[in-house]
Amino acid sequence: MKAWLDEFNGFYRAEATEDEAIDAYARTHVGFTSIHPFYDGNGRLARLLSNLPVLFAGYPPIVIPVESRQDYLQALWDYERGNTDLSAFKSFVRTCWQTTLDLVAEAR
């Protein structure tokens, strides 16, 4: 738990690039789901906590759309089953985030 908290606290950087923000989101998310003791609620709380470094860096939140739920769960299951390469999960997160970034750009 201490190691996860130390890593999580290290993600708070106001000058983070988009790639660094996605990396922080992904690492926070998979790290939290691996230590969180309850089966139900892991995802909701993990998505909330994972957005904190993203928001701190000045970016809009990463939102996982309901229609992408199966892809989201598959990416997490792949990681939990031993595929410790986060590139697939980060790619999924980037795709979801791009939708949010596009909405923000349209609103301006």
What are these regions (language model features)?
Residues 3, 24-27, 48, 67, ...:
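Generic alpha-helical secondary structure signal
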Residues 31-58:
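Cytochrome P450 heme-iron axial ligand motif
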Residues 50-77:
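C-terminal end-helix/capping segment
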Residues 1-37:
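Helix-hairpin-helix/helix-loop-helix acidic hairpins
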Residues 21-24, 42-46, 89:
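Hydrophobic (often cysteine-bearing) scaffold residues that line and stabilize catalytic clefts
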Residues 10-14, 59, 78-82:
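General structural signal for alpha-helix termini and helix-helix connectors
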Residues 68-70, 74-108:
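Acidic, carboxylate-rich catalytic segments that either coordinate divalent cations
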